[in-house]
Curated annotation (Swiss-Prot):
Required for oligodendrocyte and motor neuron specification in the spinal cord, as well as for the development of somatic motor neurons in the hindbrain. Functions together with ZNF488 to promote oligodendrocyte differentiation. Cooperates with OLIG1 to establish the pMN domain of the embryonic neural tube. Antagonist of V2 interneuron and of NKX2-2-induced V3 interneuron development. Disulfide bonds: none annotated. This is Oligodendrocyte transcription factor 2. It comes from the Eukaryota. Induction: By SHH. Also induced by NKX6-1 in the developing spinal cord, but not in the rostral hindbrain. SMART domains: HLH (SM00353). It comes from Mus musculus (Mouse).
Length: 323
């Protein structure tokens, strides 16, 4: 009995576990850290004032909230678990919706998807047929229709070829009309096309008269000095030829200048593209395939005046009229 009474009496007098833990925690709080205090106490108000002040000081020194050490990772894990649960819920709801759909509804959904895909393929085939119609091989002897990939590759090559051709044409036109290769229209065109009547001036007076009015270098792109020199040379060649009298030169002086020929002032005022140009190496104008001569005389052939129809008796009369 005494032992039992002593045991009963000793129980209230014995310290509680919390009373034993708090002094030890207050003594070793600065050395062992605050993790144990945070775990054991649910809120800072449950701790003594000195312990809570120490915890606040330690948390303030570390620059974190008392609940950040333990609550940060928990919040992240909870957010990730929430997102995963949301996605799984959406997937399960979709599956439930499909499962809840009846067989006629599923069949209707399949038909709708199939009709949409069929319309898309129909539009694609129409577009491919329209592209095949404008391809270079469309009117050729091909017997089978190209596939979609082959059609697209052919269209790409065709576009590249046309682009290169256009760039080459632009380069040739800039060389012809640029004006930086030659200062005036070269004499290759005139020498080949318009100087042929000069050697036959002694045999054909009409051709000589035509050459007098249409000299070898007559293009309006020529400078005034070059045009005047060419006209003087042509007149000298005609006058030195063995012609019957000076009647033909008088006819040349009576006739007005050709309507297509421009005066030196007009030629200087309206040059064609800043002067003619030719190929840089040869220095002469070359007629490229499909590109006519840019001068007005080559574009519009002059009307031929039949001077040879005039008899020998009319020439002295014209000479007397001129006098």
């Amino acid at each position: 009995m005494d032992s039992d009474a002593s045991l009963v009496s000793s129980r209230p007098s014995s310290p509680e576990p919390d009373d034993l833990f708090l002094p030890a925690r207050s003594k070793g709080g600065s050395s062992s850290g605050f993790t144990g205090g945070t775990v054991s106490s649910s809120t800072p108000s449950d701790c003594p004032p000195e312990l809570s002040s120490e915890l606040r000081g330690a948390m303030g020194a570390s620059g974190a909230h008392p609940g950040d050490k333990l609550g940060g990772g928990g919040f992240k894990s909870s957010s990730s678990s929430t997102s995963s649960s949301t996605s799984s819920a959406a997937t399960s709801s979709t599956k439930k919706d499909k499962k809840q759909m009846t067989e006629p509804e599923l069949q209707q959904l399949r038909l709708k998807i199939n009709s949409r895909e069929r319309k898309r393929m129909h539009d694609l085939n129409i577009a491919m047929d329209g592209l095949r119609e404008v391809m270079p091989y469309a009117h050729g002897p091909s017997v089978r229709k190209l596939s979609k990939i082959a059609t697209l590759l052919l269209a790409r090559n065709y576009i590249l070829m046309l682009t290169n051709s256009l760039e080459e044409m632009k380069r040739l036109v800039s060389e012809i009309y640029g004006g930086h290769h030659a200062g005036f229209h070269p004499s290759a065109c005139g020498g080949l096309a318009h100087s042929a009547p000069l050697p036959t001036a002694t045999a054909h007076p009409a051709a000589a008269a035509h050459a007098a009015h249409h000299p070898a270098v007559h293009h309006p792109i020529l400078p005034p000095a070059a045009a005047a020199a060419a006209a003087a040379a042509a007149a000298a060649a005609v006058s030195s030829a063995s012609l019957p009298g000076s009647g033909l030169s008088s006819v040349g002086s009576i006739r007005p200048p050709h309507g297509l020929l421009k005066s030196p002032s007009a030629a200087a005022a309206a040059p064609l593209g800043g002067g003619g140009g030719g190929s840089g190496g040869s220095g002469g104008f070359q007629h490229w395939g499909g590109m006519p001569c840019p001068c007005s005389m080559c574009q519009v052939p002059p009307p031929h005046h039949h001077v040879s129809a005039m008899g020998a008796g009319t020439l002295p009369r014209l000479t007397s009229d001129a006098k």
